[in-house]
Amino acid sequence: MSQSETAPRLPVLPLDDAVVLPGMSVTFPVSDDEQAAALDAAVENRIVLVPRLEGAFAPIGTVAEIVGDMALPDGTRGVALEAVHRARLGPAEVGAPGLVVEVDEVIDPSDPAPEADELAREYRAVVQEVAEMRGDGVRVAQFLAGIERPGRLADTAGYAPEIPVGRKLRILETIDVVDRLREALDAQRERLADVSLRRRIRQDVS
């Protein structure tokens, strides 16, 4: 049986200039008919979130589950999404409900290379240092303590607003867990350097 006969097909929810990494929980405002059509066509409450930068779709998306449908404070529709895991995108079709694509779901290995553990420890330390500089150390420590898998730990970089969208896209597209941790760690180190510089500037002018 060919991949096209077995691969699940999910509606695409385009993310313009945004990236949602696996493990993230987000509330998504539904702002146009394209988004509404994708959500309404969800298969068993599942869709695939695909970054769209400068009009081009990324080759990797994130399978997500719709866990809530609500009205936002401004009266518009919103949905609560739980991002589950990566997916390579296959052939697509444009139909009445919008864009539907075959997905090859990518699950992180349960036993990544030993190097991943060392990178994960360093990643935790850098993120914790940033959080403590911002007076948010306890909450972030509790959050990180609940994440055991190195690949999922790297994906927490998606929550950092200072990390550029293009960098988050590279993290999304990095399937290998060790390489992904390196990419996420480099991004967090740059974030730490920026936060440290801003802190020194504030201290100098105070």
What residues fall within each predicted segment?
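N-terminal low-complexity, acidic/polar interaction/targeting segments
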Residues: 1-206
